[in-house]
Amino acid sequence: MSSIQVEPAALIKADDWRFQYRQKSRCSSSNLTMLSYGTFDIKSGVTSDELYHHNEEAILLCIRGKVNVRVRLQTFTLSYYDTLFIPLATPYTIENTCTEQALLVVCKARAENKYEPFYSSWEQFSRDERRIRHLQGKDVFLMLDVTEKADKLMAGYTIYQPYTRAWPAHNHTDQEEVYIFTKGRGAMEVYADEERKTFVHSVSEMDAVTIPVLNFHPVFSQSEQLHFIWCIAGQRYWVGDKNKDFMKGNSAELTT
C-alpha cells in the first residue's frame, strides 16, 4: 500500500484568475517613445510569479490594498499611495496577504543603467515639505525625484482642490508623461497650440492620458478633490523646480 497522500484536484473555471497584469499603454499605442504603463490586480492570499523587465526600469504605485514586494532579498510593504522603484533587469514578486484585492499601477521606461530600489512612504512623504510643492489650489508630491537615482523615470501625485485648474499651462521639449487619475472627476486638455485644441476629455477614476513631448496638458477639477499620478520619462526634473515662473504663475504658458 502506497504511503503517498492523494490530494484532491482543483477546478479552475474559465474566468477564474488570481493575479493579472493589464497592459494599458505601450509606446506603439500611445504616441510616446519611452514610457508605458499597466496595472497589477492581486487577489487576497496570492503571490505573483517572478516579474522581470529586462530592458526597463519601473515604478510601482499602490492604489488599493496592501502588498509585500520582494526584490533583491529585501521585502517592502506598500499600502495606499506608497511607491517602489524597481531597477533595470531586477526580478521581483508581489504578495497580497490582506483580505482586500490589491491594485498597483506600474510605469516603465527603457533604461541602460542599474540602480538601487527606492521605497517612498505616502504617510511620510505627504508630510515632508521637502517633497511637496504648493501651488494655487493644488499640491504636488514628489515620490521619485531627482534626489533618487534612475535613468529616465520620475513620479509622484498631484491633488487638486475642487474647482481648480492647471496654471500656467506648460509643455516639455525633453519629457513625456502619463497622468493616471486615482480619485475624483475632472477634465483634461492636451494640445500643441490653441488652434488645434481638439483633445478635450472628461476623466474619472483610473482613466489615464498620455502626453507626448511639446503638448500642453492642463487639468481641471470639478466639485470634488481630484487626485492623479504623474509619471515622467526623459530628462529628470520637475517643471516648477526648473522654471520658477511656474510656481509664481507669471505667464500664461511656458516651455521647459
Predicted regions and their residues:
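A short, N-terminal "cap"/entry segment at the start of jelly-roll beta-barrel domains
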Residues: 1-34, 49, 101, 107-156, ...
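Conserved short histidine dyad/triad with adjacent acidic residue
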Residues: 20-26, 36-54, 157-175
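Short, conserved beta-strand element in jelly-roll/cupin
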Residues: 41-42, 52-69, 109, 159-161, ...
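Short beta-strand His + acidic residue motifs that chelate non-heme Fe in jelly-roll/DSBH
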Residues: 48-50, 69-70, 78, 86, ...
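Short acidic-glycine-tyrosine-enriched beta hairpin
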Residues: 72-88, 193-214
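A short hydrophobic beta-strand segment most commonly corresponding to one strand
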Residues: 85, 99-116, 158, 210, ...
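Non-heme Fe(II)/2-oxoglutarate
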Residues: 234-256
